[in-house]
Amino acid sequence: MADQLTEEQIAEFKEAFSLFDKDGDGTITTKELGTVMRSLGQNPTEAELQDMINEVDADGNGTIDFPEFLTMMARKMKETDSEEEIREAFRVFDKDGNGFISAAELRHVMTNLGEKLTDEEVDEMIREADIDGDGQVNYEEFVTMMTCK
């Protein structure tokens, strides 16, 4: 995972890691993580901080070392890529660019993809994704639909 990072990214992350690693011992503790999160305006609980550490703490020692930090950052960057992909997909469906996917736009794209859907099926797809009930799908609803697997 971390081997897909450029040298520039690794250098950037090393700098960020140093900001977290207040005492310079090469590891980030929950206390150090909390300090940085609070300086960024977040207010995580002790349990949340522990969860964040546990998620990337590969060797189970309760702290994050630099390789574990790199893995975490690489993972986060991967998530950002998929957000960009979702945005692109939304643009494909939103033919007129008004920020909403209508039943007609959905039908058009699905037909181009070789999916012959009845009006009922198209309406059903819109209904499933249409959280606010306005009869069309906005970007937030589209993201929710795409990420709720």
From Swiss-Prot:
<dbReference type="InterPro" id="IPR011992">
    <property type="entry name" value="EF-hand-dom_pair"/>
</dbReference>
<dbReference type="InterPro" id="IPR002048">
    <property type="entry name" value="EF_hand_dom"/>
</dbReference>
<dbReference type="InterPro" id="IPR050230">
    <property type="entry name" value="CALM/Myosin/TropC-like"/>
</dbReference>
<feature type="modified residue" description="N6,N6,N6-trimethyllysine">
    <location>
        <position position="116"/>
    </location>
</feature>
<feature type="binding site">
    <location>
        <position position="98"/>
    </location>
    <ligand>
        <name>Ca(2+) 3</name>
    </ligand>
</feature>
<keyword id="KW-0488">Methylation</keyword>
<dbReference type="Pfam" id="PF13499">
    <property type="entry name" value="EF-hand_7"/>
</dbReference>
<feature type="domain" description="EF-hand 3">
    <location>
        <begin position="81"/>
        <end position="116"/>
    </location>
</feature>
<feature type="binding site">
    <location>
        <position position="57"/>
    </location>
    <ligand>
        <name>Ca(2+) 2</name>
    </ligand>
</feature>
<feature type="binding site">
    <location>
        <position position="63"/>
    </location>
    <ligand>
        <name>Ca(2+) 2</name>
    </ligand>
</feature>
<keyword id="KW-0677">Repeat</keyword>
<feature type="binding site">
    <location>
        <position position="21"/>
    </location>
    <ligand>
        <name>Ca(2+) 1</name>
    </ligand>
</feature>
<feature type="binding site">
    <location>
        <position position="134"/>
    </location>
    <ligand>
        <name>Ca(2+) 4</name>
    </ligand>
</feature>
<feature type="binding site">
    <location>
        <position position="25"/>
    </location>
    <ligand>
        <name>Ca(2+) 1</name>
    </ligand>
</feature>
<comment type="similarity">
    <text>Belongs to the calmodulin family.</text>
</comment>
<dbReference type="GO" id="GO:0005509">
    <property type="term" value="F:calcium ion binding"/>
</dbReference>
<dbReference type="GO" id="GO:0016460">
    <property type="term" value="C:myosin II complex"/>
</dbReference>
<feature type="modified residue" description="N-acetylalanine">
    <location>
        <position position="2"/>
    </location>
</feature>
<feature type="binding site">
    <location>
        <position position="96"/>
    </location>
    <ligand>
        <name>Ca(2+) 3</name>
    </ligand>
</feature>
<feature type="binding site">
    <location>
        <position position="23"/>
    </location>
    <ligand>
        <name>Ca(2+) 1</name>
    </ligand>
</feature>
<feature type="domain" description="EF-hand 1">
    <location>
        <begin position="8"/>
        <end position="43"/>
    </location>
</feature>
<feature type="binding site">
    <location>
        <position position="27"/>
    </location>
    <ligand>
        <name>Ca(2+) 1</name>
    </ligand>
</feature>
<keyword id="KW-0479">Metal-binding</keyword>
<feature type="binding site">
    <location>
        <position position="105"/>
    </location>
    <ligand>
        <name>Ca(2+) 3</name>
    </ligand>
</feature>
<dbReference type="InterPro" id="IPR018247">
    <property type="entry name" value="EF_Hand_1_Ca_BS"/>
</dbReference>
<feature type="binding site">
    <location>
        <position position="136"/>
    </location>
    <ligand>
        <name>Ca(2+) 4</name>
    </ligand>
</feature>
<feature type="binding site">
    <location>
        <position position="94"/>
    </location>
    <ligand>
        <name>Ca(2+) 3</name>
    </ligand>
</feature>
<comment type="function">
    <text>Calmodulin mediates the control of a large number of enzymes, ion channels and other proteins by Ca(2+). Among the enzymes to be stimulated by the calmodulin-Ca(2+) complex are a number of protein kinases and phosphatases.</text>
</comment>
<feature type="binding site">
    <location>
        <position position="132"/>
    </location>
    <ligand>
        <name>Ca(2+) 4</name>
    </ligand>
</feature>
<feature type="domain" description="EF-hand 2">
    <location>
        <begin position="44"/>
        <end position="79"/>
    </location>
</feature>
<feature type="binding site">
    <location>
        <position position="141"/>
    </location>
    <ligand>
        <name>Ca(2+) 4</name>
    </ligand>
</feature>
<keyword id="KW-0007">Acetylation</keyword>
<feature type="binding site">
    <location>
        <position position="59"/>
    </location>
    <ligand>
        <name>Ca(2+) 2</name>
    </ligand>
</feature>
<feature type="binding site">
    <location>
        <position position="61"/>
    </location>
    <ligand>
        <name>Ca(2+) 2</name>
    </ligand>
</feature>
<feature type="binding site">
    <location>
        <position position="130"/>
    </location>
    <ligand>
        <name>Ca(2+) 4</name>
    </ligand>
</feature>
<keyword id="KW-0106">Calcium</keyword>
<feature type="binding site">
    <location>
        <position position="32"/>
    </location>
    <ligand>
        <name>Ca(2+) 1</name>
    </ligand>
</feature>
<feature type="domain" description="EF-hand 4">
    <location>
        <begin position="117"/>
        <end position="149"/>
    </location>
</feature>
<protein>
    <recommendedName>
        <fullName>Calmodulin-B</fullName>
    </recommendedName>
</protein>
<feature type="binding site">
    <location>
        <position position="68"/>
    </location>
    <ligand>
        <name>Ca(2+) 2</name>
    </ligand>
</feature>
